Regions:
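N-terminal, Lys/Arg-enriched amphipathic/low-complexity engagement segments
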Residues: 1-27
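Charge/polar-rich, low-complexity and marginally structured segments
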Residues: 2-9, 67-185
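Phenylalanine-focused residue identity feature
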Residues: 10-12, 38, 48, 62, ...
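Short N-terminal secondary-structure initiator segments
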Residues: 13-15, 40-41, 47, 84-88
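General secondary-structure edge motif
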Residues: 18, 33-35, 79, 107
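Generic structural hydrophobic/aromatic packing signal, biased to beta-strands
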Residues: 19-21, 46, 62, 99, ...
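Compact, well-ordered interaction domains used in eukaryotic information-processing assemblies
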Residues: 26-68
């Protein structure tokens, strides 16, 4: 991943998310950070990276609305497909970081649940469809006039990054193509 997307991912890892405690657990002290104590069934807000560790240890689980599911990916792909040409839909918050983690998790699950191969392959296919459809729209939008805030607000941070980079490249290329200097003759 390019450095900028890694930065966006870092921000996601350090954002606060909601979890639900699976069991009672005393507080956990880390260098400069205390998490918990946890009481079974109660909801807590913790950093995403801490939530992952708590989930892996079986202490807590993510709230359903904080995770991406196969149905969410299908809905996004369908929404992108039915958009009018030149229109781009708004993605759910933190869609790409959640998508990357969903794909990584389904890939890991294959080791212990081989029947999940099909689910993973379908998710990868849908993810590629989404990325390709949105990328085509972003390329078209970046090669035209500057877009309004109404259009730009529908971009994720990752998409705004590629939109801005493409816009600069296309503007520079266009200027070079149309520039004529006969002083060299």
């Amino acid at each position: 991943m390019p450095l900028k997307i890694k930065n966006i991912d870092f921000l996601f890892e350090n954002s606060v998310t909601k979890i639900v405690a699976n069991r009672n657990h005393p507080e956990i002290k880390l260098a400069g950070l205390t998490i918990g104590p946890f009481q079974e069934g109660n909801e807590y807000e913790v950093y995403f990276w801490a939530a992952q560790e708590l989930a892996a240890a079986g202490i807590a689980h993510f709230r359903e609305e904080n995770c991406l599911a196969a149905t969410d990916i299908y809905k996004v792909q369908w929404k992108e497909r039915v958009q009018i040409a030149g229109q781009i839909s708004e993605l759910p918050e933190d869609f790409y970081p959640k998508l990357r983690r969903y794909l990584a998790n389904t890939k890991e699950e294959i080791a212990t649940h081989p029947e999940k191969v099909r689910e993973h392959e379908k998710a990868v296919h849908l993810a590629c469809d989404i990325v390709n459809a949105r990328l085509k729209k972003i390329i078209t939008l970046s090669s035209g006039p500057t877009q309004t805030d109404q259009v730009l607000k529908k971009f994720t941070s990752e998409e705004r990054l590629i939109y801005e980079q493409l816009g600069r490249i296309i503007t520079e290329w266009r200027a070079q193509i149309l520039e004529y200097d006969n002083k060299g003759e």
